[in-house]
């Protein structure tokens, strides 16, 4: 073969454990005319793929996790973006809420998406900036709990580089930077629910993963005081909170998700191309169409349920919350885009039983199969704590006198109760224990496709 002509095609190669790898194939042509024909045809085909981003805004948290965010982006992500002819504008954040403030000020219409390099905290900051900017531009008051929020046309890409990468792990199946970069390049799109958390008609925060009161709230509140410990603070605070074994009294009111398919205990996880999320999307579009043309204006009667008592933990998850330590997550069958949240109530129990409950999260066991655990799929919920001051003073006095004796005589069943806990909202502490939560169906989109079921593997890489 004289004067062969060659061109190289860059592609995605599937590896183990939901990881993707960059690969390339070189083609040789015997004739120059055929060579140019192939190049022209491939370029024309790529131009038709309008879902692929061409210009991205990238936020890098240089301090997240082990402080490797900038290095991870430069070594693993930037070269792939260059190969894909994606141009970027990079902002290295210098303070808390830098990314959020930037999204309120920048001209974001010129970008095809927003990329955040960091952990769940960095993603949350970008989420709040993008959702808040979209509502401001649309004239929607975020402080109104009944407001219908407007979804943003921009997608968010997550390059995992934090201490926790729960959102990335639950939407891609791994916390691997190269895999996430390739999902961005091919233009994947995944719609995801967002919960709005209010107190007294004031928006506190948005949540996409975990809202936790009691156990998880105490952990995050205690760990904030020990940032000098680094990542070890989470393990230390977790152990301390477990042995403290505090219970909190309150009332949970919730609106069951009547029209969603499935239940939290059906053992059917959310996967790529999920039919449950697809059906929810169709229902959402139908509701929007009816609202636009004022069809069937009668409002659905809301039948709220109420649960009272002493709780070790109250958790609400919009996704499985899977992570390397808990591969199945807090609620294995939670769906990313069905317009609902799985509300998990862990009532007062012994330390041993609570330990059994926690251990179930690390294996294939059903963590809801306990008499002290209740789980519901809900669209909205409210919580009001019962402060100690509301109790009868004589009962409270007698309790204080006998507290030490009871704890020493029954150490396994002791449930010392403080006045109130804090809410852990995607890793941030909320100021008020009394909250009102509403799930907004598929409010944001990610550069992801969901966890693929038994992906084909081309190698062991």
Question: Which residues fall in each region the model found?
Answer:
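Eukaryotic short linear interaction motifs
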Residues: 16-18, 35, 65-68, 89-90, ...
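ATP/NTP phosphate-donor binding region
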Residues: 1-117, 124, 128-146, 453, ...
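Catalytic core of DAGKc-family lipid kinases
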Residues: 71, 93-95, 101, 108-111, ...
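Residues that form ligand- and interface-recognition hot spots within folded domains
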Residues: 11-13, 29-33, 42, 46, ...
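Eukaryotic intrinsically disordered and solvent-exposed regulatory patches
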Residues: 41-46, 100-103, 141-145, 180-181, ...
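Short amphipathic alpha-helical molecular recognition features
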Residues: 19, 23-34, 48-51, 65-69, ...
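ATP/nucleoside-binding phosphotransfer catalytic cores, i.e., glycine-rich phosphate-binding loops
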Residues: 1-30, 34-36, 306, 327-461
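Core residues of folded domains in eukaryotic genome-function proteins
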Residues: 3-7, 21-23, 52-58, 84-87, ...
């Amino acid at each position: 073969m004289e004067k062969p002509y060659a061109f190289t095609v860059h592609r995605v190669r599937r590896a183990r454990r939901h990881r993707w790898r960059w690969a390339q194939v070189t083609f040789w042509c015997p004739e120059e005319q055929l060579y140019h024909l192939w190049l022209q045809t491939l370029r024309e085909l790529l131009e038709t793929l309008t879902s692929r981003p061409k210009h991205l805004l990238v936020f890098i948290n240089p301090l997240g996790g082990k402080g490797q965010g900038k290095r991870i982006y430069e070594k693993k992500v930037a070269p792939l973006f260059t190969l894909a002819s994606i141009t970027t504008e990079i902002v290295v954040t210098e303070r808390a809420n830098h990314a959020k403030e930037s999204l309120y000020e920048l001209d974001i219409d010129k970008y095809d998406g927003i990329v955040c390099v960091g952990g769940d905290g960095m993603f949350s900051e970008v989420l709040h900036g993008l959702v808040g900017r979209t509502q401001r531009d649309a004239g929607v008051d975020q402080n109104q709990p009944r407001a219908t929020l407007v979804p943003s046309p921009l997608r968010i890409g997550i390059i995992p580089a934090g201490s926790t990468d729960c959102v990335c792990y639950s939407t891609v199946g791994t916390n691997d930077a190269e895999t996430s970069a390739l999902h961005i390049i091919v233009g994947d799109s995944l719609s995801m629910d967002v919960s709005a958390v209010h107190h007294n008609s004031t928006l506190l925060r948005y949540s996409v993963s975990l809202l936790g009161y009691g156990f998880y709230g105490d952990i995050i509140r205690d760990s904030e005081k020990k940032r000098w410990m680094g990542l070890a603070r989470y393990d230390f605070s977790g152990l301390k909170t477990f042995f403290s074994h505090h219970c909190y009294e309150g009332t949970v009111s919730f609106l069951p998700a009547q029209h969603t398919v499935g239940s939290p205990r059906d053992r059917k996880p959310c996967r790529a191309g999920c039919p449950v999320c697809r059906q929810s999307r169709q229902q959402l579009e139908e509701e929007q169409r009816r609202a636009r043309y004022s069809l069937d204006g009668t409002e659905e009667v809301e039948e709220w349920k109420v649960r009272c008592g002493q709780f070790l933990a109250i958790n609400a998850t919009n996704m499985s919350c899977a992570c390397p330590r808990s591969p199945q997550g807090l609620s294995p069958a939670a769906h990313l885009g069905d317009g609902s949240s799985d509300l998990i109530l862990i009532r007062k129990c012994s330390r041993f039983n609570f330990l059994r409950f926690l251990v179930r999260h690390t294996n294939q066991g059903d963590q809801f199969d306990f008499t002290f655990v209740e789980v519901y799929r809900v669209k909205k919920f409210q919580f009001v704590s019962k402060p100690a001051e509301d109790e009868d003073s004589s009962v409270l006095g007698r309790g204080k006198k006998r507290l030490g004796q009871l704890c020493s005589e029954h150490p396994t069943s002791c449930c010392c109760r403080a006045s109130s806990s804090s809410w852990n909202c995607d890793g941030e502490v909320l100021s008020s224990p009394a909250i009102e939560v509403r799930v907004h169906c598929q409010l944001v989109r990610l550069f992801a496709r969901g966890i693929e079921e038994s992906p084909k593997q081309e190698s062991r890489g």
